[in-house]
Amino acid sequence: MEAPPYSAAAVDVVRLPGGRTERDHVAVEEPLEIRIGGSPVAVTMRTPGHDEELALGFCLSEGLRPEGARVPDDLAANTVDVDAPGFDPARLQRSFYTTSSCGVCGKGALDAVAVESPRVTAELRIPLSLVSSLPDSLRAAQAAFAVTGGLHATGLFSSAGELLCVREDVGRHNALDKVIGWAFGAGRLPLADSVLCVSGRLSFELVQKAAVAGCPVMVAVGAPSSLAVDLAADRGVTLCGFVRGGTANVYTEAWRISG
């Protein structure tokens, strides 16, 4: 699988020891301005590509109900305008600025961060053997990571373990937003019969995005944070961390995992 050309940039690097100068590739990071009905609402640092999905996923994760997204012909390439009829700009009391490492930087309090969503009640049950296979399946699909070593990924899997969508980005929250935006466009929301697998750790924000999308199970090779566990318990999301070598730690709603 070949990495998309917009995801990697060639740079000179000095190899030590030895001092050889060689060409290498690093992940591309650029700003994207998200607008709703022409009004700027957010700037996020992301890896270019699937920008409409990113904007849609971002809006959905903030509790908005968009109808579509487009790159306006009369604006810079790093701008996406989302169509969300009835959106009130005053509803967002702060200006969003999201970095590639922290999607909620600038949110001053937990009350400002939390997005209301129904408790996930999906009766999905999957075996540990399937759960433990997902990180390897995700890694095998990370074409840009193979070139740069510098991108996070989110994979959306069916209840049978089929990879439905994978997105890579310098920001783990962006990768998840892109997958949620893809699912919106594919008519797959809510994700009641699906599993999300993320590279790295499980943060509060990632769990919140999964809950808003209605996904019952999240899988990661890393650990969850305390707030991630608390939120998953509150929203009914099964949280599986340290998934490797046929083992997993299930922090919440363990009844969905057998074995």
List the predicted regions and their residue ranges:
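C-terminal binding/interaction regions
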Residues: 163, 223, 227-259
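Short, solvent-exposed amphipathic alpha-helical segments in soluble enzyme
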Residues: 49-50, 59-60, 171, 180-185, ...
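Intrinsically disordered, low-complexity regions enriched in acidic/Ser/Thr/Pro/Gln residues
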Residues: 1-159, 163-166
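Short Gly/Pro-enriched loop/turn and capping motifs at secondary-structure junctions
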Residues: 201-204, 224-226
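A conserved acidic, glycine/proline-rich C-terminal tail/linker
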Residues: 214-226
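Glycine- and Gly-Pro-enriched alpha-helical subdomains that act as flexible
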Residues: 144-200, 207, 212
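Glycine- and other small-residue-rich loops at beta-strand/loop junctions that grip anionic moieties
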Residues: 102, 168, 195-199, 221, ...
